[in-house]
Amino acid sequence: MSMYTTAQLLAANEQKFKFDPLFLRLFFRESYPFTTEKVYLSQIPGLVNMALYVSPIVSGEVIRSRGGSTSEFTPGYVKPKHEVNPQMTLRRLPDEDPQNLADPAYRRRRIIMQNMRDEELAIAQVEEMQAVSAVLKGKYTMTGEAFDPVEVDMGRSEENNITQSGGTEWSKRDKSTYDPTDDIEAYALNASGVVNIIVFDPKGWALFRSFKAVKEKLDTRRGSNSELETAVKDLGKAVSYKGMYGDVAIVVYSGQYVENGVKKNFLPDNTMVLGNTQARGLRTYGCIQDADAQREGINASARYPKNWVTTGDPAREFTMIQSAPLMLLADPDEFVSVQLA
């Protein structure tokens, strides 16, 4: 028996543990949870004739011959889980006042909430990685609980993924005389819409701003474009708004995720992404596959947090959040990804 109801867990999860990474916030504002295990693209408003190309991955290799186009898709299922160890409730928590120790019941509540925070963060990192990969490459590999890895390909045009080479590398240009504006305008022509924002990783930004022409043209004053400033303000410590370059906002993203205990950057070194803040990114979710959720009438949901105790000798208590995320772009060609060199 849990001391928290699902509604309480959902409320606590949403209010206290909201993770707000850049790509999800800027480009993936629509959310579509489904009551079915599969996500049906035909049921998303305005998404006419969109299909994904899906291919199984065996031993790290994409098996194209076994892939195919589909308008219905089964997302990977993720469910990070923790045990609430009774021994932990007997020890002082790191931020506890030694002169005013809390009781074990209070510590248990704190541990449960910390577990839920960690589980939410784990899922949010999966979502952001899917979102970043969709924008950067137009595809990503989806994995999940007891789920064979599958590549999800949204059909990005080859010319929208650019690698500087053959003398076009910015690192080889004269920083005092060369103006990279023409390059950016040429790259932007590949986008299916208007480009109003450029996102750099820190190293890509350092290379870009090393040009004298950039320093002269970059407008760092506020008030240049109120709509864009609203879109990119208050994005957290991993994001820095650098100013306007003509009518394009410049943002630097240093967001990280944790893989096998090691921090890694979401954006590869020397990355530049051209896009539009009105691009239609879709957060879709398959149904929650849990008998308790079904009994509570929760099927279509981005999250299902639960806290329960199994009887026995001894009894054991657990926390878990379940989700079946699939981040999609209605038009993957709204973005142009450039690997700077």
Curated annotation (Swiss-Prot):
Record-stated family: Belongs to the lambda phage major capsid protein family.
Species annotation: Escherichia phage lambda
Purpose: Assembles to form an icosahedral capsid with a T=7 symmetry. The icosahedral capsid is about 60 nm in diameter and composed of 415 major capsid proteins. The assembly is primed by the interaction between capsid assembly protease and portal dodecamer, and major capsid proteins assemble cooperatively to form the procapsid with the help of capsid scaffolding protein. Major capsid protein forms hexons and pentons of the icosahedron. Viral genomic DNA is packaged into the procapsid through the portal vertex.
Major subcellular site: virion
Assembly with partners or alone: Homomultimer. Interacts with FI protein.
GO cellular component: host cell cytoplasm; T=7 icosahedral viral capsid; viral capsid
Coiled coil: none
Cystine residue pairs: none
Subcellular location: Virion; Host cytoplasm
Protein's recorded name: Major capsid protein
